[in-house]
Amino acid sequence: MLLPSNLTTSTLMTSSSESYDADNPGLPPEPILSDYVEMFTLVLNFIVGAPLNLAAYTQLSERPTSTRLDLLKRSLNYSDLLVLFIYVPSRACWLLTYDWRGGDALCKIVKMFHTFAFQSSSNVIVCIAVDRLLSVLSPSHHSPNKALKRTKMMLIVAWIVALVISCPQLFIWKAYLALPEYNWSQCLQIWEIARMEKFNKPQVVPEFDAEFWYSILHISLVFWIPCIIIMLSYIIVISWVWINSRPSIRHTSSFSFHTGCDTVDTVLTRASEWNPLKTFSRHVNIKEPEKPMTTPRIVVSDETEVPLTQRPSISPSEASAVMRTGVHTSTSYNANLNRSRALRVSLLLVVAYIICWLPYNLISLIQFLDRDFFSSYLKHVHFCQQLIIFNSVVNPWLYGFFGPRRPSTTGAGRH
């Protein structure tokens, strides 16, 4: 069974011409083994993913105050729910019936929401990456309210852009009665309909291949442009972390006593709490004005450490000595720990997105470069498509909605 020429994540119904039986041209096509396998995986993804995402939705919506990461997780949860409750049922119903019975209006609306669901997923992941980048570059990181407003604005723009990109589907997809004698109709792109109507007529190659350029533009907007933005953002963040994790006199207190190097959590914490990046300098100028009372950072090397508030009480003189050696209060400890967790959760979500989306979109590019090579890998395409659905299933596990709650009154809007 061939895939449509517009092999993008918005192409979610196989056209009638793709499953058309050449030996019996007058009969509707019948499902094959790969269709039943795909239907099984869709149902399995729904059974596992729907409860997880609904539980995540319930817990996220019950939180009285929202950090930046909570806002990003909410938007990602909304897009995952769209994928699981709009795309999965409609695709499964089509595989079950091999017929489109919703009429022209529903065909257009469903296709628009398909594109909207996948485009919003990509856009939210971009927001997560850009938020991590701005936490290093932007001065608003030191103002929690400004940072929270910035994240809200990014998400609003992301959803509006997803809606705008989805609207052309209203004009590209149509319900088409392919076999009137069997009342067998399909929801097809206008180019597929034109090819079917001209099946027995001489083919005229158009000067401007609208379908080709539409496919290139669409796959770029859905995946490749977001992927490039994500990669650039994390390259800058990782470069910033690496440069500023080099051993120096100023940060000797952040070394591990076992290895003599910065711990992983210390490096991650620095990426979210240091001053905004202006130039990639190595702090050559050591002669800085000494401040009368500076509070060094705490090394967050183990998330299971006992908070400082639970440690034995000490005398005032000992407390003064502890302050001089760089130990913060439990509030500072929790804030640094939450920043470190936020960075790791963000990185996990981005990595899962790349792993799940890249195979399908690579194959979609191959069809434009080498159709013969592309044809040899068609049997793997639906498996790669299921990886994209699986991404919506695994996201709640990655951002850990079932984990321990963080303090809602400390560091709000800073993560």
Curated annotation (Swiss-Prot):
G-protein coupled receptor (GPCR) that forms a heterodimer with daf-37 to control dauer formation and behavior. Required for the response to dauer inducing pheromones such as the ascarosides ascr#2, ascr#3 and ascr#5. Expressed in the ASI and ASK chemosensory neurons and in the IL-2 interneurons, but weakly expressed in other head neurons in hermaphrodites. GO terms for biological process: G protein-coupled receptor signaling pathway; G protein-coupled receptor signaling pathway involved in dauer larval development; neuropeptide signaling pathway; regulation of cAMP-mediated signaling; regulation of dauer entry. Heterodimer; with daf-37. Disulfide bonds join 107-187. This is G-protein coupled receptor daf-38. It comes from Caenorhabditis elegans. Residues 1-35, 97-108, 174-222, 367-382 are extracellular. Residues 1-19 have a biased composition (Low complexity). The gene is daf-38. It is found in: Cell membrane. Gene3D superfamilies: Rhodopsin 7-helix transmembrane proteins. Residues 1-25 are annotated as: Disordered. It holds the Pfam family 7tm_1.
